[in-house]
Amino acid sequence: MTETTARSIPLQIVQGDSPSAAPLQAGVKQLGGDKINRSPVQFADAPVLRKPSWIRVRIPSGNAVQNLKAKLRENRLVTVCEEASCPNIHECFGHGTATFMILGEVCTRRCSFCDVAHGRPKPPDANEPASLGQTVADMGLKYVVVTSVDRDDLRDGGAQHFVDCITAIREKSPGTRIEVLTPDFRGKGRMERALEILAQNPPDVFNHNIETVPDLYRNVRPGADYQWSLNLLKNFKAQHPDVPTKSGIMLGLGEDFEQIKATLRDLRAHDVDMITIGQYLQPTAHHHPVLKYWTPEDYKALEDYGYELGFSHVASGPMVRSSYHADVQAKGAGVS
């Protein structure tokens, strides 16, 4: 198999924020270098890998993208498609679908792969659930994904706001199926509180991304814990056995094939039903570099392995993202 890879990356490990880091102001976005410079993991210069031929995005014609953006701005809503610089934004917006990001545009974490802004968030917008519900109804969406930034500043991690959004969507658009893509609710007692709250009005699909293999967590997801994320998925499934669970993993951050397979086995052992596997693409020069472009043949092999493990649906390909064609994935898991 042909592969494009860099063998290693030098890391400079520092403790806490940079000494020159200015105090964070509520609602002010730290992006790119400003964000990553606050991370406990700093990346030395690494060679930039040339994107292979299979990393291509089709940009549709027409006004659908601008029309959807206008509708979102009109209702003061945010999509992770825009905030995280998703490469599939034109395709999804062109088909009138979007993944809504609630609880603001500022994340309390500083993950090295993510283009969402870091900082000190503002309090949740009490009007957001109603605005979201009305927008979903106005757009006639049959399937929506609702995600959020990490909110380590909130006692429940934002779980009540998720439930308020689910409730508002179901009130305004009863036929819409709802998938939530949640943060990890990490913190003393926070997972238990979050799961208790989510039980008030569970989604149709519960998604939480594992993101990468455990050996890379310190570099890729500082502030997160691999086993904690697995436990969140398993505990939700134990409480709601009829609700499909889902997770996702990115490739190209330094993992090897056996580590990926082991992570897939861990997810199945924690009762995850659906999995997405896609290529990591570096958002800016300040973020974690791409260390390898996995081939389409690799993704097919992982898809086959996922089905061997018993996943009800496996979406595996270079441009696959967690909420990309989420409605199709959900149908594969029996959500109708």
From Swiss-Prot:
Binds 2 [4Fe-4S] clusters per subunit. One cluster is coordinated with 3 cysteines and an exchangeable S-adenosyl-L-methionine. Residues 93-312 form the Radical SAM core domain. It comes from the Bacteria. Belongs to the radical SAM superfamily. Lipoyl synthase family. It is found in: Cytoplasm. It comes from Stenotrophomonas maltophilia (strain K279a). SMART domains: Elp3. [4Fe-4S] cluster 2 binds at C107, C111, C114. Its EC number is 2.8.1.8. It is an enzyme of class 2 (transferase). CDD domains: Radical_SAM (cd01335). GO terms for molecular function: 4 iron, 4 sulfur cluster binding; lipoate synthase activity; metal ion binding. Keywords: 4Fe-4S, Cytoplasm, Iron, Iron-sulfur, Metal-binding, S-adenosyl-L-methionine, Transferase. Pathway: Protein modification; protein lipoylation via endogenous pathway; protein N(6)-(lipoyl)lysine from octanoyl-[acyl-carrier-protein]: step 2/2. It catalyses: [[Fe-S] cluster scaffold protein carrying a second [4Fe-4S](2+) cluster] + N(6)-octanoyl-L-lysyl-[protein] + 2 oxidized [2Fe-2S]-[ferredoxin] + 2 S-adenosyl-L-methionine + 4 H(+) = [[Fe-S] cluster scaffold protein] + N(6)-[(R)-dihydrolipoyl]-L-lysyl-[protein] + 4 Fe(3+) + 2 hydrogen sulfide + 2 5'-deoxyadenosine + 2 L-methionine + 2 reduced [2Fe-2S]-[ferredoxin]. Coiled coil: none annotated. GO terms for cellular component: cytoplasm. The gene is lipA. [4Fe-4S] cluster 1 binds at C81, C86, C92, S323. This is Lipoyl synthase.
